[in-house]
Regions:
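Basic, glycine/lysine-rich polyanion-binding surfaces/domains
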Residues: 1-193
Length: 193
């Protein structure tokens, strides 16, 4: 039996505890369920905005000359022909056509991609990708434990982000940009669905 002390913690765990979050187990991670009440927090996000720690979601990088070809092999969408800084929603299917997971694929360049997957399917996808790699040349890395991820949602979040960058509020849907602040690098996208 897994105890709360055995669970993975996101980089924001300390802040969740300090701000009184009710923490629960979710796919092997200790995650905040709520801070005040579900109704109050729902209303806040619908009327203004909210920040969600989604660091438990899987994040992979694919780099090298065949990275796009490999992603075309495992995804239901055309990935290699995406534009730079474009994001595409896709499915990763099994050999019978059933869905292993739904993912978002980000194209940094012709030879560099990032994928975000659901936390519950992360290890299954890592295994699947290793099985079907074949002779394609690319480097795969699971960067989940080395990075953090947040989602900002709500009608007023662009007003807040405008104070940090003039570019971010002008991003089109399913596009991204890369920013930095001090030593931290950020990938910022408009990908809600």
């Amino acid at each position: 039996m897994t105890t709360m002390t055995d669970l993975k913690k996101t980089p924001f765990h300390k802040a969740h505890v300090e701000h009184g979050a009710k923490l629960v187990e979710y796919t092997g991670w200790e995650m905040p369920l709520l801070y005040t009440s579900i109704i109050e927090e729902h209303r806040q996000v619908r009327e203004a905005g909210g920040l969600f720690d989604v660091s438990h979601m899987g994040r992979f990088t694919f780099k090298g000359r065949d990275a796009g070809r490999f992603l075309d092999r495992v995804c239901t969408r055309d990935i290699a022909n995406m534009q730079d800084r474009q994001v595409r929603y896709a499915l990763v299917c099994n050999e019978e056509g059933g869905c292993r997971d739904d993912v978002l694929v980000y194209r940094q360049s012709e030879t560099e991609y990032t994928m975000v997957c659901n936390a519950a399917n992360r290890s299954k996808l890592v295994d699947h990708f290793a099985e079907v790699k074949g002779d394609l040349v690319y480097r795969f890395a699971d960067i989940t434990d080395k990075t953090a991820m947040v989602a900002l949602q709500g009608p007023k979040v662009m007003d807040v982000l405008a104070g940090f960058s003039k570019e971010i509020p002008t991003l089109k849907r399913y596009r991204f940009t890369e920013k930095s602040l001090f030593i931290a690098k950020f990938l910022v996208s408009r990908t809600g669905y």
